Amino acid sequence: MAKAKTKNENKETLEQTLWKAADKLRKNMDAAEYKHVVLGLIFLKYISDAFKDLHQKLVKGEGEYEGADPEDINEYRAENVFYVPPQARWEYLQGRAKLPTNGKDIDDAMDAIEKDNPSLKGVLPKQYARPNLDKQSLGGLIDLLLGA
């Protein structure tokens, strides 16, 4: 029988994942820059996961979610969850992680999220398409965060 992971084991896994993410970018930029890249992606993954959880409940349409529209922004606002448009969802971005346009895709995702969530206007980082950010490393970082 498999042993369940303890909270400390999960914490170590997250710490290891974050260090691996930093290592992937370290060769192309200094620490002051790559922390914004990594933290922006972590935020994007977090809101996408929260959106996905509620989206699944809305699609099921059971209990308090009966008759709810899973693409209605107001359903998410009512639950204090950020609405994530299709082109900004983690699954979409992960599917495009190996493309040379992955940086632009992430910048576009951040713009789309800000457009649908006015409280985030001007807050999200949009520097992923810049030339000095290695797109192969960025794709690897997206894949790395997939398991986080």
Language-model segments: what does each one mean?
Residues 1-148:
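Non-catalytic, mostly N-terminal accessory regions of nucleic-acid modification and defense proteins
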